[in-house]
Amino acid sequence: MLGVGNEGMSTLPGLNQIQFEGFCRFIDRGLTEELFKFPKIEDTDQEIEFQLFVETYQLVEPSIKEKDAVYESLTYSSELYVSAGLIWKNSKNIQEQTIFIGNIPLMNSLGTSIVNGIYRIVINQILQSPGIYYQSELDHKGISVYTGTIISDWGGRLELEIDRKARIWARVSRKQKISILVLSSAMGSNLNEILENVCYPEIFLSFLNDKEEKKIGSKESAILEFYRQFACVGGDPVFPESLCRELQKKFFQQRCELGEIGRRNMNRRLNLDIPQNNTFLLPRDILTAADHLIGMKFRMGTLDDMNHLKNKRIRSVADLLQDQFGLALVRLENMVRGTICGAIRYKLIPTPQNLVTSTPLTTTYESFFGLHPLSQVLDRTNPLTQIVHGRKLSYLGPGGLTGRTASFRIRDIHSSHYGRICPIDTSEGINVGLIGSLAIHARIGRWGSIESPFFEISERSKRIHMLYLSPSRDEYYMIATGNYLALNQGNQEEQIVPARYRQEFLTIAWEQVHLRSIFSFQYFSIGASLIPFIEHNDANRALMSSNMQRQAVPLSQSEKCIVGTGLERQVALDSGTLAIAEHEGKIIYKDTNKIVLFGSGETLSVPLVIYRRSNKNTCMHQKSQVQRGKCIKRGQILADGAATVGGELSLGKNVLVAYMPWEGYNSEDAVLISDRLVYEDIYTSFHIRKYEIQTHVTSNGPERITNKIPHLEVHLLRNLDKNGLVILGSWVEAGDILVGKLTPQMAKESSYAPEDRLLRAILGIQVSTSKETCLKLPIGGRGRVIDVRWLHKKGGSGYNPETIHIYILQKREIKVGDKVAGRHGNKGIVSKILARQDMPYLQDGRPVDMVFNPLGVPSRMNVGQIFECSLGLAGDVLDRHYRIAPFDERYEQEASRKLVFSELYQASKQTSNPWIFEPEYPGKSRIFDGRTGTPFEQPVIIGNPYILKLIHQVDDKIHGRSSGHYALVTQQPLKGRAKQGGQRVGEMEVWALEGFGVAHILQEMLTYKSDHIKARQEVLGTTIIGGTISKPVDAPESFRLLVRELRSLALELNHFLVSEKNFRIHRKEV
């Protein structure tokens, strides 16, 4: 496809438009397409007919707002109504009613849906495009075997292969092969038609013997042979009348449905002119494909590259939602058919409203959003994460690949990805290369292909003309890959430029160029485009950086980056975290909750987000940026959101950093930091945790929320109000009661006296007691209560419990064990917090904030951090901010180094500080030891890079166990922080303890602290009375388990003692 865009490109495209356009396409076209497929339903006597009148369908605006749907844990959806009619054929009467089919979850402008109060997003999937592909493989003898694979719309495969004798065979789903003559005859063609419609009839006749002629003597014989090979389990199949229709329906229509995309690809690859609406595999397709396969055998064609993007298609949110809608309508059809038959059987008069229920559509979409692998909970750690999540492309999911089976060729970068899929941004681990990210300017075309924009170079017209090219079209053009700003310098006709043509990178003259790139960021995703000096980094470290930026925690005092790339403002705008003025006017009132704007004769109130929790427990908060009485324009920023300053993305802080070793505290990627970062709240972040509890109706009565909890200390209940809920604004510690709840419980008969039980039996009195089931604050949850929500479900019953949500705000300073990172893949763990007077200090007396290990730079080959560090120092001194596009070396050699040195020289000159730029060692400076005041021996690189605090924090990971739960079988402690588990002592840890000879510690690890039941029970009592812990006599439980498993294999294992005196054998039970 060759699409024409707008002339010029002053702004970037909307970064959320991929998701939103897909949903709009589903509402505009997908709904009507599936509704038109809904058949007319008749009863068995063909007296009543039910049908839908699709032209009158309507979607109703939701009755609740997005914020209320999140607050009340509801689904933000629209009700779908369609006109339906019942037609009595005898009397020709029509009863028409508007029926409610179900709820369809809606998508907001950010590309997300709210299902059960949770933001969810649907990921785009990359699949092999339906059509035919020719490939060549070597068999076990080293001979090339040519195959043609026909892929259906749902992923089924039909393979055609040609052997050494030029005989053509067909395999369905990689099962046993049959002759192509049998396949074509089963599809309805006779031998004469086959020979008339092929280019090489002599090849088809060459392997036609008596046995083969018998198989294709008639259509019934061919179908019987086909059925015998692929569907018959055993025995000799017979040919019933319905077998032909059944086989045509189940195989040739369902399994070989090409779809519109598949039909288009087949026509283009095989040079056919079959109508586009004929979406099923035809005999003509098979025969033409066989002709091309014969041509491949004799080197008269080109093989297909399966990994080229022209052979891939994007299964967007529109396709996924349309598939689910079609599935729901099939279920609805079966339900209506059964209801009509039941009504006729019991002689009831049905109506359209009685026949249709909303259950199929509602349950289908709830199941899709809750269980489908491509429907994921929106990651809302920071504004960048929200945008990047919606632009992911996945090879995984139904009909796709798996992380275990995907080959390296699929994961690798392909030349067709250029400008469409980012070569940097992908996941780490088993899914590397299988989950990618769209390039910034890429868009998804009508046929599911990824299109990339280019500027057309025209000698006739001086106007800039922009084209969107699909992967199948850009191979025919010479595309200049250099930046057009560099190309515009000097005489273009005399320049030699790098270009791309037919998957090859060439160097050609300017007059041979057809198209050129539009932007230097065109090839990268959003995450990679935010890395300054990315061209100086190794690709692996750039990958880590693009992933770690999505893990950055919004800080309480955000700060713009000194060195950026220029995309920070666009990301912040499209993330939805900013409050933008929709109309121009004057600010007449503002507070922390809202901004009131007067303009165009009306008053508009803009509510602000105040301490709202994200699903990663980070704090989403908006702060007003306008003053009362000021006039504003449409599109102006009213309030900054989390991790934004002045409308720009601000994920971290510019801190003073030195690259030097310091007493070994920063070895192996450890980081030494100053206590200034703690006391001045430089890296302080707010986190909001949600705790919930439900009330049920039990068999002994309903559970009660109350503040009168027996047998609990008053101190634990100090924060509860009269209703049993924690008071808003109170400070709570671990172990405090957040919600007081009592569950009724039947008392045990054995706990009462005999006369009491006799009296109750005579009078029939049942005495029940209550069990305390309060919501307690777990370890590590201390903080301030900021919100309490009591949600009452309509028609409250045991299946619709009441839910109470408690939100607690935590203030976290940076501490030892937290993870910090730069934007170049340079990450580390805080190892020590040093007093600021002991930190190394500069020649002007300023102490350094962080000390990084210089050995982490050369081996990782991420030199971009050094450029950013030095340029950040110049920007900090000169009070400037820099926005640098990548690959600036295309203008001239060493452009990045010249820029950094010139800015450092200017900063040194303006401030009269020669130590900022010293010609002997530019970028370095001599600094002093804060403990002794003596200068270090070597000059050190200092600067102001942009450092992020990541969500991997020690408060979420640190864990200790005194006692807890044990596994039922092995009787060993469970694993994991959530289960209050223990720390595993494995085989290598035992070797280490053995190497140091600590026998008693090793025995404790393997007995008292692990799975010796009797010994660990004695430890507590012995410790209390101050006695000596006795040694365990018998074996631990895991050894007993081993003995039992051996006995199940008929292997007896016992303990024998042989006396030294009389050699008697004493048997002891294990």
Curated annotation (Swiss-Prot):
<comment type="subunit">
    <text>In plastids the minimal PEP RNA polymerase catalytic core is composed of four subunits: alpha, beta, beta', and beta''. When a (nuclear-encoded) sigma factor is associated with the core the holoenzyme is formed, which can initiate transcription.</text>
</comment>
<dbReference type="Pfam" id="PF04565">
    <property type="entry name" value="RNA_pol_Rpb2_3"/>
</dbReference>
<dbReference type="InterPro" id="IPR007641">
    <property type="entry name" value="RNA_pol_Rpb2_7"/>
</dbReference>
<dbReference type="InterPro" id="IPR014724">
    <property type="entry name" value="RNA_pol_RPB2_OB-fold"/>
</dbReference>
<dbReference type="InterPro" id="IPR042107">
    <property type="entry name" value="DNA-dir_RNA_pol_bsu_ext_1_sf"/>
</dbReference>
<dbReference type="InterPro" id="IPR037033">
    <property type="entry name" value="DNA-dir_RNAP_su2_hyb_sf"/>
</dbReference>
<keyword id="KW-0804">Transcription</keyword>
<dbReference type="GO" id="GO:0003899">
    <property type="term" value="F:DNA-directed RNA polymerase activity"/>
</dbReference>
<dbReference type="InterPro" id="IPR007121">
    <property type="entry name" value="RNA_pol_bsu_CS"/>
</dbReference>
<comment type="similarity">
    <text>Belongs to the RNA polymerase beta chain family.</text>
</comment>
<dbReference type="GO" id="GO:0003677">
    <property type="term" value="F:DNA binding"/>
</dbReference>
<dbReference type="GO" id="GO:0009507">
    <property type="term" value="C:chloroplast"/>
</dbReference>
<protein>
    <recommendedName>
        <fullName>DNA-directed RNA polymerase subunit beta</fullName>
        <ecNumber>2.7.7.6</ecNumber>
    </recommendedName>
</protein>
<dbReference type="Pfam" id="PF00562">
    <property type="entry name" value="RNA_pol_Rpb2_6"/>
</dbReference>
<keyword id="KW-0150">Chloroplast</keyword>
<dbReference type="GO" id="GO:0006351">
    <property type="term" value="P:DNA-templated transcription"/>
</dbReference>
<dbReference type="InterPro" id="IPR037034">
    <property type="entry name" value="RNA_pol_Rpb2_2_sf"/>
</dbReference>
<dbReference type="GO" id="GO:0000428">
    <property type="term" value="C:DNA-directed RNA polymerase complex"/>
</dbReference>
<dbReference type="Pfam" id="PF04560">
    <property type="entry name" value="RNA_pol_Rpb2_7"/>
</dbReference>
<keyword id="KW-0240">DNA-directed RNA polymerase</keyword>
<comment type="function">
    <text>DNA-dependent RNA polymerase catalyzes the transcription of DNA into RNA using the four ribonucleoside triphosphates as substrates.</text>
</comment>
<dbReference type="InterPro" id="IPR010243">
    <property type="entry name" value="RNA_pol_bsu_bac"/>
</dbReference>
<dbReference type="GO" id="GO:0005739">
    <property type="term" value="C:mitochondrion"/>
</dbReference>
<dbReference type="InterPro" id="IPR015712">
    <property type="entry name" value="DNA-dir_RNA_pol_su2"/>
</dbReference>
<dbReference type="InterPro" id="IPR007645">
    <property type="entry name" value="RNA_pol_Rpb2_3"/>
</dbReference>
<dbReference type="Pfam" id="PF04561">
    <property type="entry name" value="RNA_pol_Rpb2_2"/>
</dbReference>
<dbReference type="InterPro" id="IPR007642">
    <property type="entry name" value="RNA_pol_Rpb2_2"/>
</dbReference>
<dbReference type="InterPro" id="IPR007644">
    <property type="entry name" value="RNA_pol_bsu_protrusion"/>
</dbReference>
<dbReference type="Pfam" id="PF04563">
    <property type="entry name" value="RNA_pol_Rpb2_1"/>
</dbReference>
<keyword id="KW-0808">Transferase</keyword>
<keyword id="KW-0548">Nucleotidyltransferase</keyword>
<keyword id="KW-0934">Plastid</keyword>
<dbReference type="GO" id="GO:0032549">
    <property type="term" value="F:ribonucleoside binding"/>
</dbReference>
<dbReference type="InterPro" id="IPR007120">
    <property type="entry name" value="DNA-dir_RNAP_su2_dom"/>
</dbReference>
